[in-house]
């Protein structure tokens, strides 16, 4: 997936990812950190995405995992 496509897909799921962070994390700064970490991991691990049409589900799963790790450090 090229960079422009990846950015487009991330923007499409940004709202959903934010809602996930709101459900899992209390502090706004933790939510912003989780969003940023999710984007970074999604970029670095895009080779693990099997089919582009599952990008949203895949990104949400990454976000959930990031939030779980964040909550464990609190």
Q: Which residues are covered by each model-predicted region?
A:
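A short, charge-rich alpha-helical start-of-domain segment used by transcription regulators
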Residues: 1-19, 23, 29-35, 43
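Arg/Lys-rich amphipathic alpha helix in sigma70-family domain 2
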Residues: 50, 64-73
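Structural recognition of an alpha-helix C-terminal capping motif at a helix-to-coil junction
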Residues: 19, 33-40, 44, 53-65
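A broad detector of the eukaryotic-type serine/threonine protein kinase catalytic domain
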Residues: 44-47, 74
